From Swiss-Prot:
PANTHER family: G PATCH DOMAIN CONTAINING PROTEIN (PTHR23149), G PATCH DOMAIN-CONTAINING PROTEIN 4 (PTHR23149:SF9)
Pfam families registered for this protein in UniProt: G-patch
Compositional bias (Acidic residues): 334-346
PROSITE patterns: G_PATCH
Modified residues (N-acetylmethionine): M1
Biased composition (Basic and acidic residues): 118-138, 224-237, 374-392
Annotated crosslink Glycyl lysine isopeptide (Lys-Gly) (interchain with G-Cter in SUMO2) location: K46
Claim: Acetylation is one of the keywords in the record: yes
Residue list for modification Phosphoserine: S128, S130, S258
Name of the protein in question: G patch domain-containing protein 4
Protein source organism: Rattus norvegicus
GO biological process, one term: hematopoietic progenitor cell differentiation
Length: 407
């Protein structure tokens, strides 16, 4: 039969390691005399109410009465002599338990007196106790200073006083200070009782003076705050003036832009931080797009007769013009300028309006020049923009050449 080795738990292994460090070996018992247990207690699954290490078969295997009889018999010695038989004990150990009777003072009623026909009859024990108390007074446990002096025969912790060195001068000085302090207190009380009315008048005057001082301090603080506010407003006003000047210079610089930006109706955008500035910039972009589309439809040309789109230029070959057509174009240009100015009036300041008036005049001049060029379209000849490039014939001439080739 093969014996299965015991599987030791982690706790058992740790306990064995600790015991081995201290010189224990397997098979030895615990304790100084090595008479303790040799095997560790093992806890199994409990399904009863018994405690740990309980042996249910102990009551059948442990014969305690026989052990007790043998122990008492061994302790007794029987001596037989002339006078008879004597029993003697070897040890003073008692085989019986000494059951001490508990005191019943706080468990039951204590009898102190008996009542006989409505009269109290005290016990003799109490009377004897009272007589003893009257004869010998019990000294207190905590002694007073006087009792300590008597017991120590007038000695104190000041060892120099035993030789004769005392602090009479210091004690006299302290007593004089205390008397002077008490005299001052008594004098102040007497003055307070004798003159209650005279003290009330100066107290009212003091209150008035305090109020006046507080009012003066409040006035001075208000003045200082007012001066600080004025200085702050002056500085902010100066800063705003400087900012306005800078903005004005920027707007004038943008207004004197290139001719192409003027043709497209470009104006220097005023950098505004509010929501109105954002709305005005959006409106300007829409107007520029419209203006560009109208110029492309009308075939706007610049001062030199060059088309804005960069295509071939038309040169006037005759003096014939259409007055009705030119007047109509001028009206449309003027209406566009008026609508732009009316929409911008609400969002602009006085300084910006002046700048816009200058721009309006320049636009009007440019429109008049463009219209003068566009009215001369009856007899035109098509040429290249640059002199070095090849001249292009009129589209009608091209059509005639194609017909000739086909014939």
């Amino acid at each position: 039969m093969s014996v299965t080795p015991e599987v030791k738990s982690r706790g058992m292994k740790f306990a064995e390691e600790q015991l081995l460090k201290h010189g224990w070996t397997q098979g030895k018992g615990l304790g100084r005399k090595e008479n303790g247990i040799t095997q560790a207690l093992k806890v199994t699954l409990k399904q009863d109410t018994h405690g740990v290490g309980h042996d249910p078969a102990k009551e059948f295997t442990d014969h305690w009465w026989s052990d007790l009889f043998n122990k008492t018999a061994a302790n007794l010695v029987v001596d037989s002599g002339k006078d008879g038989v004597q029993i003697r004990r070897l040890s003073k150990e008692t085989t019986q338990r000494s059951h001490s009777k508990p005191s019943l003072l706080y468990q039951k009623f204590v009898k102190t007196a008996t009542l006989t026909s409505g009269e109290e009859k005290p016990d003799r024990d109490l009377e004897s106790c009272s007589d003893v108390d009257n004869r010998e007074p019990i000294p207190p446990k905590i002694l007073t200073d006087e009792m300590l002096l008597k017991a120590c025969e007038g000695r104190t912790a000041h060892k120099a006083a035993r030789i004769g060195i005392t602090m009479k001068a210091k004690l006299a000085r302290l007593e004089a200070q205390e008397q002077a302090f008490l005299a001052r207190l008594k004098g102040s009380k007497d003055v307070g009782t004798s003159q209650p009315l005279t003290d009330s008048e100066p107290s009212q005057k003091k209150k008035k003076r305090r109020k006046q001082k507080e009012e003066e301090e409040a006035a001075t603080t208000e003045k200082s705050l007012g001066e600080e506010l004025l200085e702050h407003t002056d500085k902010s006003f100066r800063k705003s003036k400087k900012k306005k000047k800078k903005k004005k210079d920027e707007r004038e610089g943008t207004a004197i832009g290139s001719e192409e930006e003027e043709a497209a109706g470009v104006c220097g955008p005023a950098e505004l931080s509010t929501e109105q500035s954002d709305q005005s910039s959006r409106k300007k972009k829409k107007r520029r797009r419209r203006h560009h589309e109208e110029e492309e439809e009308m075939g706007v040309c610049d001062e030199g007769g060059r088309d804005v789109t960069g295509g071939p230029k038309a040169v006037n070959s005759g003096a014939d013009t259409d007055p009705w057509r030119s007047s109509k174009k001028r009206q449309t240009c003027e209406e566009d300028l008026d609508t732009q100015d009316e929409e911008d009036k609400d969002d602009l300041t006085k300084k910006e309006r002046k700048v816009r008036k200058k721009d309006k005049k320049k636009r009007q001049q440019y429109c008049e020049e463009v219209l003068d060029v566009s009215n001369k379209d009856d007899g035109r000849t098509w040429e290249a923009e640059d002199g070095g490039e090849r001249s292009q014939p009129h589209p009608k001439a091209r059509a005639k050449k194609k017909k000739r080739k086909t014939d």
